[in-house]
UniProtKB/Swiss-Prot annotation:
The glycine cleavage system is composed of four proteins: P, T, L and H. In this organism, the P 'protein' is a heterodimer of two subunits. It comes from the Bacteria. It comes from Bacillus cereus (strain ATCC 10987 / NRS 248). One of its GO terms (biological process) is glycine decarboxylation via glycine cleavage system. Its cofactor is pyridoxal 5'-phosphate. The glycine cleavage system catalyzes the degradation of glycine. The P protein binds the alpha-amino group of glycine through its pyridoxal phosphate cofactor; CO(2) is released and the remaining methylamine moiety is then transferred to the lipoamide cofactor of the H protein. Belongs to the GcvP family. C-terminal subunit subfamily. It catalyses: N(6)-[(R)-lipoyl]-L-lysyl-[glycine-cleavage complex H protein] + glycine + H(+) = N(6)-[(R)-S(8)-aminomethyldihydrolipoyl]-L-lysyl-[glycine-cleavage complex H protein] + CO2. InterPro entries: GcvPB (IPR023012), GDC-P_C (IPR049316), GDC-P_N (IPR049315), GDC_P (IPR020581), PyrdxlP-dep_Trfase (IPR015424), PyrdxlP-dep_Trfase_major (IPR015421), PyrdxlP-dep_Trfase_small (IPR015422). This is Probable glycine dehydrogenase (decarboxylating) subunit 2. It is an enzyme of class 1 (oxidoreductase).
Amino acid sequence: MKNQDQALIFEVSKEGRIGYSLPKLDVEEVKLEDVFESDYIRVEDAELPEVSELDIMRHYTALSNRNHGVDSGFYPLGSCTMKYNPKINESVARFAGFANIHPLQDEKTVQGAMELMYDLQEHLIEITGMDTVTLQPAAGAHGEWTGLMLIRAYHEANGDFNRTKVIVPDSAHGTNPASATVAGFETITVKSNEHGLVDLEDLKRVVNEETAALMLTNPNTLGLFEENILEMAEIVHNAGGKLYYDGANLNAVLSQARPGDMGFDVVHLNLHKTFTGPHGGGGPGSGPVGVKADLIPYLPKPILEKTEDGYRFNYDRPEAIGRVKPFYGNFGINVRAYTYIRSMGPDGLRAVTEYAVLNANYMMRRLAPFYDLPFDRHCKHEFVLSGRRQKKLGVRTLDIAKRLLDFGYHPPTIYFPLNVEECIMIEPTETESKETLDGFIDKMIQIAKEVEENPEVVQEAPHTTVIKRLDETMAARKPVLRYEKPAPVQV
């Protein structure tokens, strides 16, 4: 039943069928022509489906059953931290005092919500080792851009208009160079060494008086901790640059190490990842930015302050970069993150990291005999394999990912980081049991054996999903991006 073909909602449509009846009009009827200019009025009626309420419910329920999420199965998407989202978060976020307020209310009427946001900021300050935090950015890349704009404002305020370059590792998230470009910087790539870490000699080569910042994820996207981080910070700071922390992998160091103690000047966090706000289609993000003291004047306004009379937003920020989002962040996600932090406590957050790292290393060691391991050393919260061995037998990493669909698993991240050939990037998170990990590992081993014994099974996968293998060339060259009503059948 789950895998049967599903008609489009337009194909379910029946002329004259309605799903909802409006009450009888009890006010004066107004014609569109009397309100809008003709340029804004449709010439032809929109081709909207005409369906009953039951049709709608069955249609979208059937589609939802095809979705894969953390609540329905293992989701080892590397660098995404697809951990289970505790349902107590949802209960707290639905409290009337949080769910039914409006951002334009008088501050005196939402002091409880403001207290929660202020306390969340204080928790994040402690977790990261920063001097203050703003909750305004909406998600990770938005936080990156905000942090880079703060760095830009800092340099310009100090007359360093020639600092136009941001350095990123060759293993960096794609959003790092993208955010730097949008913020008006030129990106310079620093190479990784044979151990998967930033090459210090290459870093010394590219750092100069034009360097605005070095962006790093620590541990990096190979799942390896940048053990030379203090020396890297010294190199950048001695050149007058700032050190930026991409918090995508913070799950690997919670209550174990703090970016602020490593020498980072700016950090963005992903509350929708590390701190269990639903993501991956489940809800909006939240990308708070933390800074050291010398960058505080440039934080986006307003900033949330605690006074003797309660909490208030301070708009008197002459050096601020301005607003980066209407109102003050995605409040509902912040409530969920606050609930998670308070539920876990410092010891719980430490355990999060310990189990995340344990799970990743366990999986890596079990899979290492069957796939190439580019960097054979202890990893942190995630690790990368390579499908080079399988590629020599005619099977690509993409084929392996599609074969996993047959077993009900969401595939890992593939072909990223870019500096690993046929990359397979796996992040199990701390919330998965050994039994779940073993089930996935067993299927990965089965696929590796199929590649050697019956490669066609993998090359032609998936076999059990509703949608089989797509014609990727045709999809790229002649994409169908909108519904087109089929022509009438000629009799």
